[in-house]
Amino acid sequence: MRLLARLIALPVRGYRLLFSPWVGFNCRYQPTCSAYALDALERHGPFKGTYLMLRRIGRCHPFGGSGYDPVPGADPKHDRCCGRTP
């Protein structure tokens, strides 16, 4: 992971360590939003990874979707099925 991506990942890791145990593991998606954020930063770098992370967090609300939603490129079979490009 690039240095900038590691810096962006610090608040996500802090959330997972400090807040997630208190508020519960109640993400609407699989993988969880924090796992998605770390995977997006690792796979796509700091800029596209941050974009994907913010887009996912924006969709995670009671009126948003739910279910299996991996990072583009993480599951090629799912990408082909749904017409997503990495």
Curated annotation (Swiss-Prot):
Major localization listed first in the record, in broad terms: membrane
Record key words, sorted: Cell inner membrane, Cell membrane, Membrane
Lipid bilayer topology: Peripheral membrane protein
Presence of keyword Glycoprotein: no
InterPro entries documented for this protein: Membr_insert_effic_factor_YidD
Cellular compartments annotated: Cell inner membrane
Record carries keyword Cell inner membrane: yes
Pfam families: YidD (PF01809)
CC annotations in GO: plasma membrane
Assigned protein family: Belongs to the UPF0161 family.
Function field: Could be involved in insertion of integral membrane proteins into the membrane.
Name the record gives this protein: Putative membrane protein insertion efficiency factor
Species for this entry: Ruegeria sp. (strain TM1040) (Silicibacter sp.)
